[in-house]
Amino acid sequence: MFSSRTFIPLGSGLAIMASAFAAQADYYLREPIPLPDGGIMELGSIALLPEKKIAVTTRRGDVWICTGAYEKDLSKVTWKKFAEGLHEPLGAFWKDGSLYLTQRPEVTRLQDTDGDGTADVFETINSGWGINGDYHEYAFGSPADKEGNIWVVLCLTGSGGAASDWRGWCMRITPDGKMIPTCSGIRSPGGIGFNHAGDVFYTDNQGPWNGSSSLKWLKPGSFQGNPTGNKYHTLANLPEPPKPTDGSRIVTERERLPEFVPPAVIFPHAKVGQSPTGIAADVSGGKFGPWENQLYVGEQTHSEVQRVALEQVNGIYQGAVFKFLAGFGSGIIPLRLDTQTGHLFAGGSSRGWASRGGKPFTFERVTWTGTTPFEIRTMKAESDGFTLDFTEPAGDSAGDPASYSMDAWTYIYQSKYGSPEVDQTVPKITAATLSPDKKSVRLKIDGLTKGHVHHLEAKGVKSASGTPLWHAEAWYTLNEIPK
């Protein structure tokens, strides 16, 4: 599921990281939450409960309830085990007095009917997919959507097989327990969630037919790119999903496979993490900073949280990924943002794979300090370039094309594991026009390429007060060029 560790070089690399963490503390307070003594807390999911309690699930099948995670003094946190004996839940939410979990073999509803603080009713909502014991057969589940459906993405068997029913598919579980096959083409999810509009996205990891890890839109009826599980269309009398051409390019295959929805945002391998995981939408109304309607995406290998700004162009999602939060104690898997209070909760585990954080597991709280960093807030595609929106007025440097540079590339769409960066280009930034309020800049660019990742560096840009960008890079996946 996840890739091998990338080590940070000694010397100057450590100095750069230390400087970045110091800057991060000015904007975001990251605090470890004490864990229960003796508990092996490799967290797989987080659910927010009434009365500011939090439920977490573990790799080994336990459910714990945390009290006090919102308090200023985290040393007073208490824990109570709510359930045990489950099968690696990777999705949890609270609704109408019940805790819903997505386990490897099923979606389950847990209830505490006698009020003693532990679950005594375990009800199977749906178990319509297969498992065979392979370690890779994860099942990630969403909270309920607007219609009450739970979306479940099913990992393949191993890296490239589909030995159990519906592996490599996304299913919707309806409130009355029916299972609806919804999308094919999935490989190795790391998380699933909604954007502010209620559309569903998941993260998929690098591997066969995935040149690099990415964030993907689960449009009903779509093909997500990996054909390994396509054989299961016969189980529901569905039309046979498309057969891609090995060694092609996604932009080429889209022309002949209309069901193929491209990755919304590609995370270039090692540059923007290696194992994207949980997804949290910011609909907090500014309680977590100026990122309203954007997504936060966990990163297991690099122990980070990235920030994603999406847009739709010609009906297709695309957008930019930015570096955001770093320095977590272990590899981040689940994320949950409390949109009422502005607290971001992150769970971590090395899970047998290495992570930069170094610890075997962690549970952490992140709070915005109220100080806004100077950042590129959004990056939006234009017919002949991009528009950047800043979090505060920029200085004159933002109107100088020399303050920016760009390169672009794509990946081989192939059955082999991953892909190098190929078809490289160097788009030329010919003009940079600041808006009257200096909070945005229009970059005119020669050489935009449909289907390429466009990597922007804005290292010469400073704010009106002379502050450099906290993160001066963005990676934009240009699936469509606006007309």
Predicted regions and their residues:
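Intrinsically disordered, low-complexity Ser/Thr/Gly-rich stretches
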Residues: 400-437
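N-terminal secretory signal peptides that target proteins for export/translocation
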Residues: 1-6
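Extracytoplasmic/surface-exposed domains of secreted proteins
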Residues: 384-408, 436-471
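A structural signal for the main folded, soluble domain(s) of proteins
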Residues: 251-259, 418, 457, 468, ...
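Beta-propeller domains with acidic blade repeats across secreted/periplasmic ectodomains
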Residues: 23-373, 379-385, 396
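Acidic, Ser/Thr/Gly/Pro-rich low-complexity segments and short DxT(G/T)-type signature motifs
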Residues: 369-378, 395, 411-412, 421, ...
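Generic structural detector for well-ordered beta-strands
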Residues: 34, 81, 389, 405, ...
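Bacterial N-terminal signal peptides
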Residues: 9-19
